[in-house]
């Protein structure tokens, strides 16, 4: 993983963890296991794709997965709206050279194993590599 991919993911994770501290139990880089896996809702952020557009510009595709045990999906919907606002705020305050506000590319709802329900938000962005 490129150094700035990691830096972007770390900044976004911190922004979501602090901005959603009253709504979620945590933000993770992979699905938690053990006792953490039974405390809902939580967010998992994954890098789906990243590639160089040219020598200076890199494309990053992130999947933000909201995992909940609310079968109606209302909890995930509420959190996803807040995520959009938090990403907009992150874009306006970051010191990284992001070339435009993260774009929501796709949204999917999925029933997971056990009683988990998830909403998957696919965000894309381009940035200048330093």
Predicted feature residues:
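Short amphipathic alpha-helical coupling segments at ligand-binding clamshell hinges
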Residues: 79-83
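Short, conserved charged micro-motifs
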Residues: 71-78
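Conserved beta-strand segments that form the floor/walls of ligand-binding pockets within enzyme
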Residues: 44, 65, 122
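Small/polar-rich, solvent-exposed N-terminal microdomains that initiate assembly or binding
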Residues: 1-54, 74, 85, 90, ...
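Short, charged interaction patches at domain edges and termini
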Residues: 1-14, 47-57, 98-130
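Short beta-strand-to-loop capping motifs
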Residues: 66-70, 125-127
């Amino acid at each position: 993983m490129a150094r700035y991919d990691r830096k972007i993911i770390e900044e976004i994770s911190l922004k979501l963890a602090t901005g959603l501290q009253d709504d979620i139990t945590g933000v993770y880089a992979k699905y938690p296991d053990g006792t953490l896996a039974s405390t809902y809702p939580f967010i998992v952020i994954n890098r789906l794709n990243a590639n160089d557009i040219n020598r200076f510009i890199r494309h990053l595709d992130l999947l933000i997965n909201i995992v909940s045990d609310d079968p109606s999906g209302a909890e995930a919907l509420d959190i996803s709206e807040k995520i959009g606002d938090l990403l907009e705020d992150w874009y306006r305050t970051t010191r990284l050279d992001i070339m435009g506000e993260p774009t929501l590319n796709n949204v999917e709802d999925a029933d997971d194993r056990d009683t988990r329900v998830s909403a998957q938000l696919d965000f894309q962005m381009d940035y200048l590599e330093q």
